[in-house]
């Protein structure tokens, strides 16, 4: 068990009652609206906040237990914490900031490890600079490096992207993906941005009004129609992990395989065999009850309906099982009635557009060639 | 350069500089501690501590000197005990002048340091804590460097104010040439002496030069430290 937490804490007018565990060593997102208790939760895990009651365990070792009075101080928990506002020490250079945690770690990183982390985050050219001269994205990367260099047992990221504009966010997201895939540190990411969570998380804990309301793998949670209003998803989407099969160099296309079938997308910069993560917006999925012919879309995936939920206005959301992968489609209620859709009904999903992110490194979102 | 000054006058100048230096150095550690306490902690009696710190600003210096005299005179219980136990004598000694200056200028130091400490983001200490730094470590390596502009500004202001202290010194340790006759006391003495107008003018000019120099130095130092600390 990477992390297990039961946290009960009262503020005036707010009560946090979280209980969740992280088994997966990858990236777990704590996802929920502002004010739902996300930051309080990670502050309690880090030791910066002492909960009224509860128990927190990291890799099987308790760090807090109100029953026995155990409360390991934050400085002894070895939990890396990257704050939303980076919190670099303004009086130290980037190098001084990076060394701050490394020098105090009971297990200081070797110079080879230091070099690898600096290289991974692309901050080698910033070492002599002062934090005040860095951009927002650079600051977050240095803060990530500072936390990693203490060789933490767990890494907490509290909305590290929230204060950044789109360009800065695009600059740091690939680093977070690499971190997730290469650093071998379990990561807990706090976020209220669905896009980031869908792109980065392996597992999601959904939190609302101080309670964890759902937890599980990202594809399962994001496609659960009953959670749509809670996750604040105005536009439902499916998340699918696929393998790169081969490239059609002349056509500029790449064929991907997942357990529901195959998809052609605009060329992905990854070798065959590499894993990619697909995000497919429900509104980009059309449904047909028989195999359509003479249409421009090339990606047709068979499946059957498992659930229909009322969507906003004239729309409804349809959940499909495509060979074990979950696909969501948003169509009008009139179309659903016309096609006679209901649970169990076999359909063909026509996918108009896919966003692709490599699992292991940077890649901009790509769109399907033909719509 | 010293041709215009008599031996007694240069003696007063050096004594002034020494008294002020010792006063500032002695008051600095408690000033840093007090400023930190007032900047970051809430405790019962905080308002009282705050008022006590500021008392020397509003109390007439003569009263302060009088209070010191009745507390630390060699015949007073505390002063007698210090003298007999440690051989420490404040009354009628330059160390007494330094003590009086230290107390009078204490609020200047506390105010400047407290302001710069209050401006430090408490989140930085939290970040240091998650990186493995204990309380003293955080204070020395995060709080103190970031408060340095305030510490320097406070020290220089207090130093300049010490150079001008008159009432508390003359009341507590009297006006002894070579021992407690600092610049202001020397000016006062020159004015009281027939034919001493020229000496008074020279010493006054010296005082003005010292004060202006101190202020300029304070601004330069604060600006440099701000630049170095990246703020």
Features from the language model and the residues they span:
Chain B
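Interhelical loop and adjacent transmembrane-helix boundary motif
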Residues: 1-8, 172-212
């Amino acid at each position: 068990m990477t992390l297990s937490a039961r946290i009960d804490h009262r503020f005036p007018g707010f009560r946090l009652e979280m209980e969740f565990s992280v088994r997966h060593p990858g990236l777990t997102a704590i996802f929920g609206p502002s004010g739902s208790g996300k930051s309080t939760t990670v502050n309690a895990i880090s030791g910066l906040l002492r909960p009224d009651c509860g128990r927190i365990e990291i890799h099987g070792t308790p760090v807090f237990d109100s029953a026995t009075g155990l409360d390991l101080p934050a400085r002894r928990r070895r939990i890396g914490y990257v704050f939303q506002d980076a919190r670099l020490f303004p009086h130290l250079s980037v190098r001084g900031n990076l060394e701050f945690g490394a020098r105090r770690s009971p297990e200081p990183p070797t110079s080879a490890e230091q070099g690898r982390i600096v290289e991974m985050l692309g901050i080698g050219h910033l070492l002599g600079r002062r934090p005040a001269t860095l951009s927002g994205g650079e600051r977050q990367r240095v803060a990530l490096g500072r936390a990693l260099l203490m060789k933490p047992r767990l890494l907490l990221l509290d909305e590290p992207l929230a204060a950044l504009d789109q360009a800065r966010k695009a600059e740091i997201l690939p680093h977070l993906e690499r971190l997730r895939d290469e650093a071998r540190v379990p990561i807990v990411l706090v976020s209220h941005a669905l896009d980031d969570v869908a792109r980065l998380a392996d597992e999601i804990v959904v939190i609302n009004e101080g309670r964890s309301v759902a937890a599980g793998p990202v594809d399962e949670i994001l496609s659960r129609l009953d959670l749509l209003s809670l996750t604040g998803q105005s536009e439902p989407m499916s998340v699918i992990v696929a393998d790169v099969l081969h490239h059609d160099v002349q056509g500029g296309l790449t064929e991907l395989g997942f357990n529901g079938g195959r998809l052609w997308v605009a060329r992905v910069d990854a070798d065959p065999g590499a894993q990619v993560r697909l995000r497919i917006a429900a509104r980009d999925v059309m449904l047909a009850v028989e195999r359509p012919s003479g249409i421009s879309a090339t990606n047709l995936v068979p499946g059957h309906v498992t659930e229909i939920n009322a969507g906003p206005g004239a729309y409804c959301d349809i959940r499909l099982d495509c060979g074990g992968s979950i696909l969501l489609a948003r169509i009008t209620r009139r179309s659903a009635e016309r096609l006679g859709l209901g649970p169990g009904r076999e359909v063909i999903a026509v996918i108009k557009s896919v966003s692709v992110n490599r699992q292991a490194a940077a890649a901009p979102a790509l769109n399907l060639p033909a719509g | 350069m010293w041709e215009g000054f008599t031996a007694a006058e240069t003696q007063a100048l050096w004594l002034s500089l020494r008294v002020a230096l010792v006063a500032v150095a002695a008051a600095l550690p408690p000033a840093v501690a007090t400023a930190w306490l007032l900047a970051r902690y809430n405790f019962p009696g905080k308002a009282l501590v705050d008022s006590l710190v500021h008392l020397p600003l509003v109390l007439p210096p003569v009263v302060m000197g009088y209070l010191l005299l009745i507390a630390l005179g060699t015949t007073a219980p505390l002063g007698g005990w210090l003298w007999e136990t440690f051989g420490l004598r404040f009354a009628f000694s330059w160390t007494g002048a330094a003590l009086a200056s230290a107390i009078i200028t204490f609020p200047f130091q506390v105010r400047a340091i407290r302001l710069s400490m209050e401006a430090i983001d408490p989140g930085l200490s939290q970040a240091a804590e998650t990186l493995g730094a204990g309380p003293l470590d955080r204070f020395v390596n995060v709080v103190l460097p970031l408060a340095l502009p305030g510490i320097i500004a406070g020290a220089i202001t207090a130093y300049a104010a010490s150079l001008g202290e008159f009432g508390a010194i003359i009341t507590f340790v009297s006006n002894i040439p070579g021992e407690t006759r600092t610049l202001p006391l020397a000016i006062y003495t020159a004015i009281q002496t027939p034919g001493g107008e020229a000496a008074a003018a020279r010493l006054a000019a010296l005082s003005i030069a010292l004060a202006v120099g101190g202020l300029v130095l304070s601004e330069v130092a604060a600006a440099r430290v701000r630049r170095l600390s990246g703020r």
